[in-house]
Amino acid sequence: MEVILLEKVRNLGNLGDKVHVKSGYGRNYLIPQNKAVFATEQNIELFEKRRAELEKKAQQNLANAEQRAAKLNDTTIVISAMASDEGKLYGSVGVNEIKDALIEKQIEISKREIVMPEGPLHSIGNYVVEVHVHSDVVANLQVEIIPAK
């Protein structure tokens, strides 16, 4: 299936690229999320007319993402969790706990944006967690896990 991307999609292409994707990915994700349209002659003409508007919107999204990243880079969250005397947690600190701690600080974020490639955190200490606020912008969030009293 051929589609035209209406915004930059990670590991796929940039705004305006005509790409070939599997039909399920196109129909079930890209098109419903308004990230792409079918690559018909009519849609290609419509896209060329709207290209400047879409590029301006993409620049605004990038600027907003950079502001959010700057705010997240300056943020340190402290999470209190039950732990043994050796510093091992009873359970773990994952994406949901980090998201909840950020919401308490009035920082809106989705679970999809938080990336923990090594999995949940299992011990007390200081960690750096990546937050992908945009396909081009990555923030580093400081997470401190302390033992609950």
From Swiss-Prot:
Entry keyword annotation includes Ribosomal protein: yes
This protein's UniProt keywords: Ribonucleoprotein, Ribosomal protein, RNA-binding, rRNA-binding
Listed GO MF terms: rRNA binding; structural constituent of ribosome
Gene Ontology biological process: translation
Keyword RNA-binding on entry: yes
InterPro entries for this protein: Ribosomal_bL9, Ribosomal_bL9/RNase_H1_N, Ribosomal_bL9_bac/chp, Ribosomal_bL9_C, Ribosomal_bL9_C_sf, Ribosomal_bL9_N, Ribosomal_bL9_N_sf
Pfam families: Ribosomal_L9_C, Ribosomal_L9_N
Domain of life where this protein originates: Bacteria
Gene Ontology cellular component annotations, sorted alphabetically: ribonucleoprotein complex; ribosome
PANTHER family associated with the record: 50S RIBOSOMAL PROTEIN L9 (PTHR21368)
HAMAP family, A to Z: Ribosomal_bL9
Role summary: Binds to the 23S rRNA.
Family that this chain belongs to: Belongs to the bacterial ribosomal protein bL9 family.
Name of the protein in question: Large ribosomal subunit protein bL9
